[in-house]
Amino acid sequence: MAAATAADVAEDTASVYSGKLTLYVFLTCGVAATGGLIIGYDIGISGGVTSMDTFLGKFFPSVLHQEQTAQGTSQYCKFNSQPLTAFTSSLYLAALVASFFVASFTRALGRKWSMFGGGVSFLAGATLNGAARNVAMLIVGRILLGIGVAFCGLSTPIYLSEMAPPRLRGMLNIGLQLMITVGIFSANLVNYGAAKIRGGWGWRVSLGLAAAPACVIAVGSLFLPDSPSSLINRGRHEQARRVLRRIRGTDEVDDEYGDLVAAASEIEVYSGCSARRRPWRDVLQRRYRPQLAMAVLIPFFQQLTGINVIMFYAPVLFKTIGLGGDASLMSAVITGLVNIVATFVSIATVDSLGRRKLLFQGGCQMLVSQVIIGTLIGVVFGTSGDGNISRALAVCIVVFICVYVAGFAWSWGPLGVLLPSEIFPLEVRPAGQSISVAVNMLCTFAVAEAFLPMLCHMRFGLFYFFSGWVLVMTLFVSAFLPETKGVPIEKMTVVWRTHWFWGRFYCNQDADAHVQVANSKV
């Protein structure tokens, strides 16, 4: 019954809403999606830079010495260094703190200025890191990068979901994940080239070139219109109608415009006009409990797939299993290319197959490949970490890492960003997305901090640890995640109210209020 009701909403919307995928909205979403470049570039650049001897020699000489004298050291432990880990993870701690302030900024000034602020902050951090003279400059630069990631990570997914036609929301929103994968791949290519620069300054090129994607989103955002939902929420109704006409390519937008206004009017029906000033309190109310649970659990599960272990530390990990410096960087390039190609699979299927099927299939693929990777590494190095790996077996491990990355890239990667951005009602959307980003940053920080020590102590069992979590999240999705494909974000409440489990959080008064709002739309 629940699934049929949600499907009926999607079908009714497709028949009532006018408009199509216009070139204007495609270009607009494409420019906004470049916010993912800064996120992806940093993910890809960090692991490559920390595998460069010149970078380690300047900022972390003890790690370089440990690596070079690792004959008696476990392969699992030779890169274990708290200062090195802090360099990588400091960005995500900064993004965690910033995300709570970014929500108010995004709600008050709109999505486009939030994206602009992210680009400017990331540009400042890239400049500081490229010119770094000491570890303190590196960390301050990382903090500025983290603030930029918080701005873009919160505002861009919301913007894409609000601008896209409902039937194509998944495809256009996943453009953000595509840009993240392009950023990772570009960073891997930059690292591969920078490692060959003579004179020991190649790492400056890697870190400094983060300014390029920062400039793209900062400049591009200046030419973007704000989304109709954001404009309505700030009382700019006529401007919202004009933007809606342009992005839909038709003057017949009364039905969609009316639904957007009605969704904004739910604030008054439920709580009165003052609710506009208290989204943080409202998002904790019972009727938003289902969305809040997903906003917390989806990014939590996404990070416990172990993907950032691969993306942060791919060159270091490949060095650990016995590949040389150039070979490890090239292997990271290969996984980055797989990431891009597999993301196109999600773009092509997310609005036809739906979210649930992709998450289930991707979860099964990641589970199997992680178990195989852990087993192969365990066979070679055992629990002691001693031993040498053959080139053939190293290549085999890289292949299964690529299988794992592909499974993530068409499931938990893009959908971990899409789902939190499309499930919240307008009045609490920035606050809800802020919570999702904060959880993502907290979990990313924890994984980045813990990975090298966990690899040292858990050894190959670390991959079994992550595969266990993949099993848990796959079962969770099967039982508790409703299908949201094709359902307009202004009508998303029906998906939760008719769900077998989440429906209990909606009382009759809530349902009556929702009907009242729907009947009063203009």
From Swiss-Prot:
Cysteines joined through disulfide linkages: none
PROSITE patterns according to UniProt: MFS, SUGAR_TRANSPORT_1
Record topological domains on the Cytoplasmic side: 1-24, 104-111, 156-169, 226-291, 351-361, 413-434, 481-522
Transmembrane segments: 25-45, 83-103, 112-132, 135-155, 170-190, 205-225, 292-312, 330-350, 362-382, 392-412, 435-455, 460-480
Listed GO MF terms: monosaccharide transmembrane transporter activity; symporter activity
Keyword tags: Membrane, Sugar transport, Symport, Transmembrane, Transmembrane helix, Transport
Function: Mediates active uptake of hexoses by sugar:proton symport. Can transport glucose.
Family statement: Belongs to the major facilitator superfamily. Sugar transporter (TC 2.A.1.1) family.
Protein name per Swiss-Prot or TrEMBL: Sugar transport protein MST2
Species the sequence originates in: Oryza sativa subsp. japonica (Rice)
Gene responsible for this protein: MST2
